[in-house]
Amino acid sequence: MPGSGGPVATFSVWDYVVFAGLILVAAGIGLFQSFRGRKEASSDEFLLGGRQMTAVPVALSLTASFMSGITVIGTPAEAYLYGTPFWLFFISYAIMSTISAEIFVPLFYRLNITSTYEYLEMRYNKLIRVIGTSMYIIQTALYTGMVIFAPALALNQITGLDLWGVLVATGAVCIIYCTLGGLKAVIWTDVFQMIIMLGGFVAVIARGAVLQGGLGRVWNDSFYGGRLETFSFDPDPLRRHSFWTIVVGGSLMWASMYSINQSQVQRYISCRTMTHAKLSLYVNMVGLWVTVSLAMMSGLTMYSIYKDCDPFTNKDVGATDQLLPYLVMDILADFPGLPGLFVAAAYSGTLSTVSSSINALVAVTVEDFMKPAWPSLTERQLSWINMGMSVFYGAVCIGMAGVASMMGNILQAALSIFGMISGPLLGLYMLGMFFRCANSTGGLAGLASGLAITLWVGIGAQLYPPLPEKTLRLPLSVEGCVALNTSETTTMTPFSTVLQTTTPQPRPALADNWYSLSYLYFSPVGIVVTMIIALIVSAISGGCKQKKVRPELFISKSDLICFRCKKSDSEVSDLIETKPKDNQGLDSPVFYDNEIVLKEKDQQEKITKL
């Protein structure tokens, strides 16, 4: 009986058929895009889809890229263990989307760049660009290893498949369609995988609601179990999740993911116009809302079923990240094929993120290292290099899964990585975009300081996790279990057993204050430290006396919504009809706004009539 504890069924033949079929479709998209685009085998076509993508598929790809297997597995467990404060990320997603669309999109389109780190060389120097690219490569490789490992560990329990077999298979499929199809294959595969992910959540919620007597019962159980206490205005920065940590810290953390992260920027600059790029971010925002809502409802459904018999406390699972897969086999085993659909959903999330990461890693490596070192490379040579680098980074990410196995809660660990590394990088970009007095000396000093601080607190938090009173895990019960399960049901390779280590360690003085800082504040701390140190060093080293910097490298008033809305009609008309003197990247047919073309055409017709 579901919810009573004990071992659950494993995959049936039909589950394997559904799972394998969906994964083969994903790989087939890569092959299709490869054959379809053979005549357009340029580096730009491979890395940016020829800059001809439209808003909706790019938006779904943006959503799928970070709504990975970690989201499919980790977010429901978050709702089950901690309740619904995670829903406050709705506000963070809205703030992040506005910042990315209205500040960063105009800047990157104006500069007509492929790698976001090209901006660092334009604004500072070559050394800072190389450092920024290297930080991104390390961050993405580690994060991608975690994305591969965490769902593989969970799927290992319910399918019985060998852990390393799942890891290698994941990397192999991603390598195939990244190598052959490039960005178009990644985007269209993401669209397909996004549909599968949402379908998996819907299946869990629907079946759970039927078993519990409706969604009203699920909601009622969650209310009395304390899972619906969403709003906490406690200003304590050590509180894991509160209104302030999520809205302030979460907004800046997600902004660092979407505004400067190559795997995301690469998608929206592949759009055919700036309007499509901005629209893709706002549609993506809605996609994030829907995905997180379904994931949270899955977690609340899981709590309603297991409120009297927690599988983790009952030792039916070896890690909290295995809770949702356990639930799937507990409630969907009587419906052949549906467990396979869910596993495909988790696996699709992993494939989506891994493929996005590999494609972005190839882009920054080629643009920031290969092209500057060998500027005479032909398009054909670059295409072969792109494919070779896809294979290389796929292998690296599989290897990094071993490092990822040493992390704890996968959702928190994944977001912590972005806060530690992307936070200081976002501070460096904001410094360059808003402060004309900032120079390369100050930028380098600020970046080094910000990174040192975030690594210090992040690694410290990993070694000495916050005490339970700060994390506020909600109570669970095993009173309704048929019997306590004393056996370990999970089969793991030896290195993954570190997840079960609970040996107490002596805690240093900083463990209960500095190291207990909410992981969502890692990014704001990195931004603030980077900008303050950079401005001080820039002032000392003559930043205000430097030669005039290119004006297109800064954010102008016209880039911001608040100023744009105040413009009179005549000012807007003048702005549209006047083509920038230095073109600012708009002379490319990809970026040339249709309105400019129409205005110039109308002006010519008026002159002809006169």
Swiss-Prot record:
Glycans are attached at residues 220, 485. GO terms for molecular function: monocarboxylate:sodium symporter activity; organic acid:sodium symporter activity; secondary active monocarboxylate transmembrane transporter activity. It is a multi-pass membrane protein. InterPro entries: Na/Glc_symporter_sf, Na/solute_symporter, SLC5sbd_SMCT1, Sodium:Solute_Symporter_SSF. One of its GO terms (biological process) is acetate transport. The keyword Hydrolase does not apply. Residues 32-52, 109-134, 184-193, 262-284, 364-390, 436-440, 541-610 are cytoplasmic. Its main location: membrane. It holds the Pfam family SSF. GO terms for cellular component: apical plasma membrane. Expressed in brain and eye 24 hours post-fertilization. In the 5 day old embryo, detected in swim bladder, pronephros (embryonic kidney), pronephric tube, and pronephric ducts, brain, trabecular bar, eyes, otic capsule, stomach, gall bladder, and gut. Keywords: Cell membrane, Glycoprotein, Ion transport, Membrane, Sodium, Sodium transport, Symport, Transmembrane, Transmembrane helix, Transport. Disulfide bonds: none annotated. It catalyses: (S)-lactate(out) + 2 Na(+)(out) = (S)-lactate(in) + 2 Na(+)(in); propanoate(out) + 2 Na(+)(out) = propanoate(in) + 2 Na(+)(in); pyruvate(out) + 2 Na(+)(out) = pyruvate(in) + 2 Na(+)(in); acetate(out) + 2 Na(+)(out) = acetate(in) + 2 Na(+)(in). CDD domains: SLC5sbd_SMCT1 (cd11519). Residues 1-10, 74-87, 156-162, 217-240, 306-340, 412-414, 462-519 are extracellular. It is found in: Apical cell membrane. The chain crosses the membrane at residues 11-31, 53-73, 88-108, 135-155, 163-183, 194-216, 241-261, 285-305, 341-363, 391-411, 415-435, 441-461, 520-540. It comes from the Eukaryota. Acts as an electrogenic sodium (Na(+)) and chloride (Cl-)-dependent sodium-coupled solute transporter, including transport of monocarboxylates (short-chain fatty acids including L-lactate, D-lactate, pyruvate, acetate, propionate, valerate and butyrate), mocarboxylate drugs (nicotinate, benzoate, salicylate and 5-aminosalicylate) and ketone bodies (beta-D-hydroxybutyrate, acetoacetate and alpha-ketoisocaproate), with a Na(+):substrate stoichiometry of between 4:1 and 2:1. Catalyzes passive carrier mediated diffusion of iodide. NCBIfam families: sss (TIGR00813). Belongs to the sodium:solute symporter (SSF) (TC 2.A.21) family. This is Sodium-coupled monocarboxylate transporter 1. It comes from Danio rerio (Zebrafish). The gene is slc5a8.
